[in-house]
Amino acid sequence: MSYIIDRRLNAKKKSTVNRQRFLKRYRKHIKKAVTDAISRRSITDLEHGEEIHIPAEDMKESFFHHGQGGHAKRVLPGNQDFIGGDRIERPPSGGAGGSGSGASDSGKGEDEFVFQITQAEFLDFMFDELALPNMIKRQLLGSDEFKLHQAGFSNQGSPGQVDVVRSLKSAHARRIALTLSKRKKLKALEKQLHLLVAKEPVLKNQVEIEQLREKISTLKSRVKRVPWLDDFDLKYHLRAKEPAPQAKAVMFCIMDVSGSMNQATKEIAKRFFILLYLFIQRNYQRTEIVFIRHHTVAMEVDEQEFFYSRETGGTIVSSALKLMQQIIEQRYPLGDWNIYAAQASDGDNWNNDSAVCKEILCKALLPKLQYFSYIEITPNAHQLLWHSYQQVKANFPDTFAMEQVVDAAEIYTVFREIFHKQVI
């Protein structure tokens, strides 16, 4: 009797691979369910997964079968009504069809397949195919991430790392070194034996010939006893770890908290930034987040104050952009950091300030930034700030994005549009 001992690390989750394969197969249905769930839920309500419904017809697997109609010969095992040679009448046209609408006292069907995805799987599908654009600046950081590279060869290693060619060369060299003297002596004895055998029968010394043959046999056996391949011959690829260059990024979150931003508009802005915060924290380990709130004066605040402070005032958008410029110059060298910014506002701004915002973005900020995104939360006609930003987008189409949000249901769609993964 044979025994199978399961030493897998995921012993309590033996179906993990099958589950991953299942999620991959029904990816389209799951992504649609996640998108619908986000439109129903609050962005902060992400403490649980989601129930996924898959229609029964989508669960069926493809298979080959005979189509209806035509002529075919078939063998029906276990038939008690017919014998070979009997002719079976063709059913009347449409006889194989259903009865259409109406109730039935027979038949069966299948319900939808329902299963639950975890919170981690929900977030994976939620942020699937999203990325911070243009993250190209990389450097060596003090991290535990490494990449392996070829660093020569070693006499020890795992069987999978054996260099076959180098091992065979080493074995061949060892055999030559260990048998060289014996082969030379063997060659000399064989030559001497050949000379003795070639003499006239009267002059042959049979005793000497037998002695030579015995010596030759002994030497050959000694040569054969040298192993063809020894543990000493095995050479293994040596792979060494070296620190991998890591991308380092900072995201500036700029939110308008002026008096023109009513409570509903502020809630939409907060939801957008909560979604951005979750996205960065989940997908990028080495990304710092700088929170800036502004009315007439801009302030750098912590996460708690950014989302929950009730301070308000007038509107000067350029104050936030100027503060962002100062922080970059003081703390984030351009050669080391990928710099991003996301701004949310209702579009209301002091009239003369929109031109100042355009100048700061075009001359001071965007040449240093990897990406700047702006969302305007308003159901009304756009104001001067939007039109000024349109001119900025015309000059920087690859690094500047702007979208309008009317209500909370559009947040996730706009977020995916801004941060969709770019194919290079």
UniProtKB/Swiss-Prot annotation:
- InterPro entries, from UniProt? UPF0229
| Region annotation (Disordered) ranges | 77-108
Residue ranges that the Swiss-Prot or TrEMBL entry lists as coiled coil: none
Family, per entry: Belongs to the UPF0229 family.
Instruction: Return the protein name.
Output: UPF0229 protein Ping_2705
Which organism does this sequence originate in? Answer: Psychromonas ingrahamii (strain DSM 17664 / CCUG 51855 / 37)
